Amino acid sequence: MAKTEKLLNRLEELRQETGVARTIFAVCPNSLSVIRASFRAAKRNNAPIYFAATLNQIDGDGGYTGMTQSMFTKMLQFEADRVNYTGCSIVAIDHGGPWLKDKQRVEKWSTEDAMNGVKKSFEDAALAGYDLIHVDPTVDINVAKGDVIDIH
C-alpha cells in the first residue's frame, strides 16, 4: 500500500476510533531539534507525520541544515528508531522549482541552469526515498514583477 494511502487510512481509523477528525501533522525540518520534537509529538499523539523540506533546507549542497537528501532520510529513520516511532511518515520536497532556492535567485541562474539544478534535486530526492515532490513553477526571474508567468 502506498504511504500516502496508509497515512490517509490511519487518519480515518483515528477519526472512527475517537470521533475526532484530524489533520496531517506537517513539519518544516529546519533543525535537528525540530525533527526530534516532531517525532516525540507524533508518537505521543499516535499521529502520522509529514516532513516538508524546502531545497534551501535540504539539498545536494547540504542546504542550511547541512543535510543532503540521502543524509536527511537516513537521519529521519535514525531519529524515528531512537524514540521508537512506528507510525507512518511521509518525506517530501516542499516548493521545489527553479529559482525557489535562494542561491539560484540571488546568483541569477539562467533558466537552463535553474532547471537542471531542480531536476538534480528531484532526482536526488527520489533516490533517497522521498515519497512526494511538490513541483512549484511559480517563480521566473526573467518575468517582470506583476506580469503573469507563461507556463508552456
Region annotations inferred by a language model:
Residues 1-25, 37-40:
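N-terminal amphipathic alpha-helix/helix-capping segment at the start of soluble metabolic enzymes
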Residues 19-23, 52-64:
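Glycine-/proline-rich flexible loop or hinge segments
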Residues 21-22, 31-35, 72:
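Terminal catalytic/cofactor-binding subdomain
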Residues 22-26, 46-52, 88-92, 132-134:
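Structural preference for beta-strand elements that scaffold enzyme active sites
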Residues 28-32, 54-58, 94-98, 138-140:
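Active-site beta-loop-alpha junctions enriched in small/polar residues
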Residues 30-33, 45, 57, 82, ...:
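Core catalytic machinery and nucleic-acid-binding channels of phosphodiester-processing enzymes
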Residues 40-45, 60-71:
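Glycine-rich loop at the start of a catalytic domain that most often binds anionic cofactors/ligands
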Residues 66-152:
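Active-site beta->alpha loop and helix N-cap motifs at the rims of alpha/beta catalytic domains
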